Regions:
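Structured, hydrophobic secondary-structure cores that serve as assembly/anchoring elements
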Residues: 1-118, 158-166, 170-176, 193-197, ...
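Charged, amphipathic alpha-helical segments
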Residues: 4, 10-12, 55, 68, ...
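Conserved aromatic
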Residues: 43, 182-187
């Protein structure tokens, strides 16, 4: 510090070590039993995935597991940490919500009196599967249509003196004596000026997929408060507490003392109604799963159902991942080819991920696989073959699944055990421990043919199991970038440099 006139020289050491760059995980696009529709959602464990997106799907009285589930389970079992999941559906879907003004044990409305609603909730998950309304609870407080995949609400701890209450989110198939509590929000208020206001405490934001006049797909967010519940959000507050009351329930002015009991909800439990959208619409019924997937039936979906989700994930500023897949689509089906090419283009445009694709359906020949692989030329895409057999974690059945459902897990294991620039292949890093067997036991000659066509073989070795035995990209020109580990090295380096350089964008040159 100078007191008399002079020149003060200062130094600022900027040679400090930056924080380690963030590492990103995988992305998967596909159908799930429940969850937000076409809203990319980050999950950090398989149990979290099941809570949000559900497990087995029932079609024709048989439980099936979506390939999305198989991919998620394998990814986390292989050491994956973050999975960006985008649920795809066929047709229009909407959330279920609370509504009704008639008191009763099975009432769907959250009432403050016998004939008036206090506020409304709606489920974050969309589809008719979230509906569980019935006129009255069955024995022991159960809901006939309550299931492991939907939820119910309960109001408790009502304090008419302070104007507070608790909201409990329960699993849809629990009972009055054995409640399965998913979330609890205590000390809630209907006073918009309080920190514990129900919309602030639970959240009221909703994401809707939009397409602007330029054809750009984006998510539009409505609502002022971030959702803190994984299952519900506040749809609207119908009877907010008048702002002239304080937290003690007494008038803050000379206004008439209207009691809190006229506004806050009464104790009780209820259900949700009016969710729309079927996982297996009549247009694609019965749904075709696993090796039975066809040109126009991909687990109850069509290929065009994937288009908007692919477009949305092109935005690298909003969504981060280093590998992306959509198991169930294979390039040999004409109706699937556009979406598979779009996925490859996504990876090329983003330049921060590899698209793992499947070029042939179950039961193909080596020559058919190489023919389909020849239609691609990109260092940002990789193909693996043949299909493999594994236990579906949601249905418990042994199923056939394409290689793309397992490769993100191999990449993740490589990242955890080594580094991204190590080859994600071989007896150790390429081991598919969750796989029972490969569709074909490839000979050395067949592996050579596949590798010459830039298809990575899934090989079987006695005593060693099933392993990924190749690491080529689909680039045709022979160069360093026709190897997966080199492409992943450059992706990692560019990502690290970009994250550090972002802090310097507006600094002086």
């Amino acid at each position: 510090t100078l007191i008399s006139p002079g020149v003060l020289a200062r130094e600022n050491d900027q040679s400090f070590i930056q924080n380690a760059p963030a590492e990103f995980g995988a992305a998967v696009i596909g159908p799930t039993v429940k969850g937000p529709v076409r809203v990319p959602t980050l999950v950090t464990s398989y149990s979290s995935y099941i809570n949000i997106f559900g497990g087995a799907a029932e079609s024709g009285s048989i439980d099936y597991g979506y390939l999305t589930n198989v991919a998620a389970n394998n990814y986390f079992r292989q050491g994956g940490t973050t999975l960006l999941t985008t649920r795809v559906t066929h047709g229009s879907f909407s959330s279920a919500f609370t509504s009704g003004s008639t008191a009763g044990s099975g009432n769907s409305g959250i009432l403050n009196t016998a004939t008036s609603e206090s506020f409304q909730l709606e489920t974050i998950s969309e589809g008719a599967i979230m509906n569980n309304y019935q006129a009255a609870d069955s024995a022991n407080g159960t809901l006939d249509s309550g299931s492991v995949d939907n939820v119910r609400w309960e109001i408790s701890g009502v304090n008419t003196g302070s104007g507070t209450f608790s909201l409990i989110v329960r699993q849809g198939n629990d009972t009055a004596t054995q409640k399965n509590i998913l979330e609890t929000f205590n000390n809630l208020s209907l006073d918009p000026f309080q920190d514990n206001y129900v919309e602030k405490a639970i959240g009221n934001q909703k994401n809707t997929l939009r397409t602007d006049s330029d054809g750009v797909v984006y998510l539009q967010t409505t609502g002022s408060y971030v959702n803190k519940s994984r299952y519900v959000r506040v749809k609207q507050v119908l009877r907010p507490t008048p702002q002239f009351f304080n937290n003690a329930g007494t008038p803050a002015s000379s206004s008439a003392g209207i009691p809190f009991v006229d506004f806050i909800p009464v104790a009780g439990s209820g259900s949700f109604i009016s969710g729309s959208g079927e996982n297996f619409p009549s247009a694609t019924s019965p749904a075709k799963f696993n090796e039975n997937i066809t040109n126009g039936n991909i687990q109850g979906l069509t290929a065009t159902d994937y288009s908007s989700s692919i477009s949305l994930l092109n935005n690298k500023d909003d969504y981060n991942f280093n590998v992306i897949t959509m198991p169930g689509l294979t390039n040999n089906f004409a109706a699937h080819a556009t979406q598979i090419n779009s996925l490859v283009s996504l990876a090329e445009n983003r330049q921060d991920c590899i698209a793992v694709i499947d070029v042939q359906a179950y039961g193909a020949t080596v020559s058919a696989v190489t023919t389909q692989a020849a239609t691609f030329d990109s260092s940002y895409a990789a193909a693996y073959w043949p299909w493999v057999q594994a236990t579906d974690p949601s249905s418990g059945q042994i199923v056939w699944a394409p290689a793309s459902a397992f490769i993100p897990g191999v990449y993740s294991f490589t990242d955890q055990s080594s580094e991204p620039w190590f080859a994600p292949a071989g007896m150790i890093r390429g081991a598919l421990g969750n796989v029972i067997q490969a569709e074909r036991k490839l000979t050395s000659s067949q592996r050579d043919t596949l590798y010459s066509a830039n298809v990575n073989p899934i090989a079987s070795f006695p005593g060693r199991g099933v392993v990924v035995f190749g690491q080529k990209t689909l680039q045709k020109r022979a160069s360093a970038l026709d190897r997966v580990n080199v492409r992943r090295l450059l992706i990692a380096v560019k990502s690290f440099i970009s994250q550090i350089a972002d802090n310097l964008v507006f600094e002086q040159n």
